[in-house]
UniProtKB/Swiss-Prot annotation:
SUPFAM superfamilies: YggU-like
Upper lineage: Bacteria, Pseudomonadati, Pseudomonadota, Gammaproteobacteria, Alteromonadales
Signal sequence segment: none
Pfam families: DUF167
Organism: Shewanella sediminis (strain HAW-EB3)
CC annotations in GO: cytoplasm
Gene3D superfamilies: YggU-like (3.30.1200.10)
Family membership: Belongs to the UPF0235 family.
InterPro entries in the cross-refs: DUF167, YggU-like_sf
Name of the featured protein: UPF0235 protein Ssed_1229
Length: 95
């Protein structure tokens, strides 16, 4: 399993999420996943909502174009980003 893969125009990200971090950032590769730190706590879906908001800004896509395929309730997630307009350098290096 790769941390990042392309499916036609879409990106598939396998993520490890670190909630309650000091700042939002893409940390780097963590095993076979991409580690992302977010400031939101893992309570009542706040971390998922914050993650989608952060990714929408990073990839310049509407929030509706980011889909959590697996891991709705855990730290290990599989995310699909539909037709990203921008790919951050750290992720582009993994493609």
């Amino acid at each position: 399993m790769l941390p990042v893969s392309k499916q036609q125009d879409d990106l598939l990200l396998n993520l490890y999420i670190q909630p309650k971090a000091s700042r939002d950032q893409i940390v780097g590769v963590h095993g076979e996943e991409l580690k992302i730190a977010i400031t939101a706590p893992p309570v009542d879906g706040k971390a998922n909502a914050h993650l989608i908001k952060y990714l929408s800004k990073a990839f310049k896509v509407p929030k509706g174009d980011i889909v959590i395929l697996k891991g709705q309730l855990g730290r290990h997630k599989q995310i699909k980003i539909l037709s990203p307009r921008l790919i951050p350098e750290i992720i582009n290096a993994l493609l």
